[in-house]
């Protein structure tokens, strides 16, 4: 087995593809690596076995290492591709603006699909664990409520491929005047949004108590939050810094289910849920959708009276298999709802044409709904008088929104200016034996060196160890229990165990050890 301490890639050094060990940093991260496409005879021979299978994700077969991306499944499926948008989504005092903040995070959380190729990560083994951390400097909020990505001071990385995914006209959508912000401009923008929200609230015949509560919210939302109003006038050393920690554990192997938890305590934000996917193969493309135990992603704002949002997953298809040009298309709809504020959002991913390049179009609506009688499931079915805002655009490029009753189009998020961000993990020699990067390092090292036979052998050894451990538990009638999470099969709300809380506290502390 290679020594992980001898395969170090410093964060700011250029990538040297001809020396693959330098692609691995001392914390085990593979920096910007996505191997060349090809080997389609091998792919097609495997796919022939998948035709007609209802759920490929439940099959027990081992892919050769050369078809895998050198990254663990738990690490790949995190929900924080842009920690800055995660940290600010609950900042606004206006409830509609908070929903728009959740939307901005939702469209940036999977930036890897925009900046990277479609890949297959390692299948997680039972009990596998992944944790990482980001430290975000209070970002500068522009007049249009988008963030200046450079102001977050996040360690980003770029690849030749990721740069080609950026639309040349992306940034030109935003006028130069709106690329900077002041406290007055933010206050003006938030006042306008509060007025629009207030009009929509008054149009509904709510009870007196609801009206009073709404009026109180409107009054408080006319002033910008402290972070927004003071941010521009502070130097980078004076700005607040916020720690974000992501934790995930493989809680079940058959079916494959993992639990995750993300938190930014200083902002009072928690995100949690369970991941499970079902995959089918039609002969020309894969269809991916949420499994039965995957109820969606929960978002909670502790500093907003525990305001909670439930975000459901869309479906997706992976096409271009026969042409050797893999691409992902999002399908169907996503619903984001908040019973406390009575605001619901429907996001619809527009069906692609049979011919031509994918357009990646999306549209949606934010509206008032009745949590006790929630029967609307399409944009067309939303009553016009309940609409608060509408949005549309390209989920790989720019998305725009308009407040109800206004013709002015505003920027929701511009993905062209965003790059992927490094994760801060402990060095390999400080990681738990069952942490993702530690478990899979022998496979990763050999894939980067293009020693695919050795990589496949190392992968099979890991899988054999898991089978032996499973057989031993079965023989001794021992039930395996997750270390860090208590799963929730009914609602998909996992909770941290005492051991999980301890690891979380350690990860949030200033003494948290991470790689260079």
From Swiss-Prot:
A GO biological-process term: intermembrane lipid transfer
Native species: Schizosaccharomyces pombe (strain 972 / ATCC 24843) (Fission yeast)
SUPFAM superfamilies: Oxysterol-binding protein-like
UniProt protein name: Oxysterol-binding protein-like protein 1
The entry's keywords: Endoplasmic reticulum, Phosphoprotein
Any GO CC annotation of this UniProt entry: cytosol
Pfam families hit by this protein: Oxysterol_BP (PF01237)
Biased composition (Polar residues): 178-187, 218-238
């Amino acid at each position: 087995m290679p020594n992980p301490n001898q395969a170090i890639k410093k964060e700011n050094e250029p990538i040297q593809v001809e020396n693959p060990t330098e692609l691995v940093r001392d914390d085990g991260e593979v920096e910007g690596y996505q191997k060349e496409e090809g080997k389609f005879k091998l792919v097609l021979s495997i796919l022939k076995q998948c035709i007609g299978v209802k759920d490929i994700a439940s099959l027990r077969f081992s892919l050769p290492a050369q078809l895998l991306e050198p990254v663990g499944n738990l690490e790949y499926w995190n929900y924080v591709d842009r920690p800055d948008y995660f940290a600010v989504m609950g900042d606004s005092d206006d409830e509609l603006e908070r929903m728009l903040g959740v939307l901005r995070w939702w469209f940036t959380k999977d930036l890897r699909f925009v900046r990277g190729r479609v890949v297959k990560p390692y299948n997680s083994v039972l009990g596998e664990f992944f944790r990482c951390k980001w430290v975000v400097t209070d970002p500068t909020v522009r007049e249009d409520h988008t963030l200046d990505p450079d102001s977050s001071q996040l360690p980003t990385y770029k690849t030749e491929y990721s740069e080609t995914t950026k639309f040349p006209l992306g940034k030109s959508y935003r006028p130069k005047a709106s690329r900077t912000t002041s406290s007055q401009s933010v206050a003006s923008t938030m006042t306008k949004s509060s007025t629009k929200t207030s009009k929509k609230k008054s149009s509904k015949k709510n009870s007196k108590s609801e009206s009073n509560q709404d009026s109180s919210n409107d009054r408080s939302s006319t002033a910008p939050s402290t972070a927004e109003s003071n941010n521009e006038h502070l130097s980078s050393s004076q700005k607040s810094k916020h720690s974000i920690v992501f934790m995930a554990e493989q809680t079940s192997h058959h079916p494959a289910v993992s639990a995750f938890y993300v938190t930014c305590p200083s902002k009072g934000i928690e995100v949690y849920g369970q991941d499970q996917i079902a995959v089918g193969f039609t002969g020309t493309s894969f269809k991916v959708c949420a499994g039965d135990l995957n109820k969606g992603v929960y978002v909670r704002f502790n500093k907003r009276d525990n305001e909670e949002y439930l975000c459901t997953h869309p479906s997706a298809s992976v096409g271009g298999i026969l042409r050797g040009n893999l691409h992902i298309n999002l399908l169907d709809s996503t619903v984001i709802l908040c019973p406390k504020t009575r605001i619901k959002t429907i996001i619809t991913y527009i069906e692609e044409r049979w011919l031509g390049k994918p357009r990646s179009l999306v549209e949606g609506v934010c509206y008032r709904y009745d949590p006790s009688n929630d029967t609307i499931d399409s944009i067309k079915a939303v009553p016009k008088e309940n609409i608060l805002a509408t949005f549309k655009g390209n989920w790989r490029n720019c998305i725009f929104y308009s407040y109800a009753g206004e013709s002015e189009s505003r920027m929701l998020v511009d993905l062209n200016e965003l790059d992927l961000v490094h994760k801060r993990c402990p060095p390999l020699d400080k990681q738990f034996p069952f942490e993702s990067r530690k478990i899979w390092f022998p496979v990763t090292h050999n894939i980067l060196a293009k020693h695919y036979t050795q990589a496949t052998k190392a992968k099979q050894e890991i899988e054999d160890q898991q089978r032996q451990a499973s057989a031993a538990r079965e023989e001794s009638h021992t039930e395996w229990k997750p270390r860090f999470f208590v799963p929730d099969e009914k609602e998909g709300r996992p909770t941290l165990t005492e051991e999980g809380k301890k690891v979380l506290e350690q990860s949030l502390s200033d003494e948290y050890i991470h790689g260079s």
